[in-house]
């Protein structure tokens, strides 16, 4: 059986491309950056680029492809963004219409792909520090919630930010904050610790994306900005076509997470 925790990125991308790995990628290719994916028509690319720069906590931009290209010079030279993500979401005019395992049939030479930092990247550092992560212990995707906090609008893109949540003791929450200070390009420090109602989350048992996790009596919910935010703002921007990763199914890059820490 393949050791997916310690596999090289190129090998993991091939398994995903060949549909041999189809689940969420948290904990895979340990030590390498994982990225959220947004693929847009060129006409929307500049507005989305501005949106990322205005919202670095939720949309920390790692790389942009050349127009019509499926790879990235640094983050995945031999990659194919249309096949190397385990599951995609396809929106037309703000409506989710398809969740395919590749998007070759939709890609054309007037599309631009964006890689956005993902909190899965700093999970390795948290685990190395002895901070347990409940979603990994329970074997499923991290829970994500749409908040009532508006993102900074840019052109046609506006909407509320999405956060991911990891429960931990207050002691571990403080340590996690210190550790993620060094990962500014993959969401950085938490945006909130404690009461989810403070920013409009009514029920932690019903995430908007991912699966719920158990929160123990001695734990608090810790929230980080989440790169699923573009999916929620896409519903408002209503481009004729936007393709994203399905939550939890990240693009595995060739760059080590140590290159993003300071």
From Swiss-Prot:
Pfam families: D-Glu_cyclase (PF07286). One of its GO terms (molecular function) is lyase activity. InterPro entries: D-Glu_cyclase (IPR009906), Putative_hydro-lyase (IPR038021), UPF0317 (IPR016938). It comes from the Bacteria. Keywords: Lyase. SUPFAM superfamilies: PSTPO5379-like (SSF160920). Belongs to the D-glutamate cyclase family. This is Putative hydro-lyase Sca_2211. It comes from Staphylococcus carnosus (strain TM300). The lineage of its organism: Bacteria, Bacillati, Bacillota, Bacilli, Bacillales.
């Amino acid at each position: 059986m393949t050791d997916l925790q310690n596999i090289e990125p190129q090998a993991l991308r091939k398994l995903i491309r060949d549909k041999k790995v189809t689940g969420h990628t948290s904990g895979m290719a340990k030590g390498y950056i994982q990225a959220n994916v947004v693929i847009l028509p060129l006409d929307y690319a500049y507005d989305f680029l501005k949106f990322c720069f205005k919202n670095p906590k939720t949309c920390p931009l790692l790389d942009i492809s050349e127009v019509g290209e499926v790879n990235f010079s640094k983050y995945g030279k031999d990659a194919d963004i249309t096949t190397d993500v385990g599951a995609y979401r396809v929106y037309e005019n703000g409506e989710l219409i398809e969740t395919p395992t590749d998007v070759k049939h939709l890609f054309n030479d007037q599309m631009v792909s964006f890689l956005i930092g993902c909190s899965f990247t700093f999970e390795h550092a948290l685990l190395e520090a002895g901070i347990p992560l409940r979603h990994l212990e329970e074997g499923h995707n991290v829970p994500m919630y749409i908040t009532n906090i508006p993102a900074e609008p840019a052109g046609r893109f506006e909407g509320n930010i999405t956060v991911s949540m990891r429960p931990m003791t207050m002691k571990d929450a403080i340590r996690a904050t210190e550790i993620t200070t060094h990962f500014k390009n993959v969401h950085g420090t938490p945006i909130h610790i404690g009461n989810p109602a403070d920013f409009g989350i009514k029920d932690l048992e019903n995430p908007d994306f991912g699966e719920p996790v158990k929160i123990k009596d001695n734990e608090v919910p810790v929230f980080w900005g989440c790169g699923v935010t573009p999916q929620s703002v896409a519903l408002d921007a209503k481009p004729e076509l936007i393709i994203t990763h399905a939550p939890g199914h990240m693009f595995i890059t060739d760059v080590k997470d140590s290159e993003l820490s300071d």
